[in-house]
């Protein structure tokens, strides 16, 4: 099997660290690994498959000889450095927002639109975490009955703000447990522990946030549905890891709850957990504590939308997924594996 020179840009962050684990778990054919990060991390070492790999400072020259680059840096760094990797012959799979809506860049969820990889020009974008988690279980239902409208509420964990967000929540919870004053928030707009923050991202048109618009804009591109209508509310919740979403879908054609459950049970990347009569809550419905450090999106609470006058055309469900894994690192490594086929 061919071996590839793989680089991770942003290798020391939460997503970059998870990408490294995913490369190993998915037995990716890595011949040589390059870990790229800021100057302050350069020189440190990280173990990969029994060997110590030194972290290098990220710069254009660091991409020389790379076959595949996994991007886990912020938008500004991605815009500055990843085109340099493409110039040097690498194919880039980028997790930032920088290139997602560029019409020349495929935006890919392998379970949905893997064929879009074929028209890449050196760059492939990884969608937003909430987009991936919501669309993976939506897709098999769309294939069944043709989705035309989505109403979504997201409950997004601290992990969405990376390692600093998780550390901040943990520090706040510890302070609460000791009865101490909560440290001043840095990663979030307000204290997250024992609280909900109904804003993720900057405010865009008509009062929606940038995070809320991503699901519509990215969903249209990924599912090839330019007329898809999405009304989304995104809320940061005091959960360490794994996002949850309540999703109501309106379809072109009639669909029964039984058909929806069967489609979800058979769908790649989805685990159906939907037995409200089960004794154990973990068997009744998905919860973020169960999906943390898992690659599958768990879906459950499947029921018809009783608010829709066309009741046979509406389904509501609940899903949970690990933001760092399938919402970011796992999806990127899955794309990279497709490049090797």
Q: Language-model features: where?
A:
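N-terminal Rossmann-like NAD(P) cofactor-binding subdomain of oxidoreductases
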Residues: 1-192, 227-229, 262, 290-291, ...
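Generic solvent-exposed, charged/amphipathic alpha-helical segments
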Residues: 20, 216-220, 261, 265
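Glycine-rich beta-alpha junction loops
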Residues: 39-41, 129-130, 154-161, 196-203, ...
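Helix-loop-beta segment of a Rossmann-like dinucleotide-binding subdomain
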Residues: 120-125, 195-206, 317-319
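A glycine-rich, Thr/Ser-enriched phosphate-binding loop motif common to dinucleotide/cofactor-binding enzymes
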Residues: 124-135, 207-216, 327-331
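Oxyanion-binding "anion nests"
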Residues: 193-240
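C-terminal active-site/capping subdomain that shapes the small-molecule cofactor and substrate pocket
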Residues: 228-341
């Amino acid at each position: 099997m061919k071996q590839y020179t793989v680089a991770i840009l942003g290798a020391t962050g939460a997503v970059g660290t998870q990408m490294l684990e995913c490369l190993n778990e998915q037995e990716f054919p890595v011949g040589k690994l390059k870990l790229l990060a800021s100057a302050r991390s350069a020189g440190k070492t990280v173990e990969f498959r029994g060997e110590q790999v030194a972290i290098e400072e990220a710069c254009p020259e660091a991409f020389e000889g790379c076959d595949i680059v996994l991007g886990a840096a912020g938008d500004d760094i991605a815009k500055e450095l990843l085109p340099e990797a493409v110039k040097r012959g690498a194919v880039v799979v980028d997790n930032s927002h920088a290139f997602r809506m560029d019409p020349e860049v495929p935006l890919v969820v392998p379970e949905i639109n893997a064929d879009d990889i074929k028209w890449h020009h050196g760059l492939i974008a990884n969608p937003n975490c909430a987009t991936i988690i919501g669309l993976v279980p939506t897709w098999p239902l769309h294939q069944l009955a043709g989705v035309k409208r989505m109403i979504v509420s997201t409950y997004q964990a601290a992990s969405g703000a990376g390692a600093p967000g998780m550390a901040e929540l943990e520090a706040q919870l510890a302070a609460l447990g000791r009865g101490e004053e909560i440290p001043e928030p840095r990663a979030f707009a307000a204290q997250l522990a024992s609280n909900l923050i109904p804003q993720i991202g900057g405010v865009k048109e008509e009062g929606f946030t940038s995070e809320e618009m991503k699901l519509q804009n990215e969903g249209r591109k990924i599912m090839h549905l330019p007329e898809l209508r999405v009304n989304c509310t995104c809320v940061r919740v005091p959960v360490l890891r794994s996002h949850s979403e309540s999703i109501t879908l309106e379809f072109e054609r009639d669909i029964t709850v039984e058909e929806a459950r069967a489609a979800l049970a058979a769908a790649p990347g989805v685990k159906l957990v939907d037995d409200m009569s089960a004794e154990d809550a973990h068997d009744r419905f998905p919860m973020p504590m169960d999906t943390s450090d898992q690659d599958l999106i768990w879906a459950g609470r499947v029921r018809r939308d009783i608010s829709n006058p066309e009741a046979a055309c509406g389904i509501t469900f609940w899903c949970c997924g690990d933001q760092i894994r399938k919402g970011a690192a796992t999806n990127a490594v899955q794309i990279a594996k497709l490049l090797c086929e």
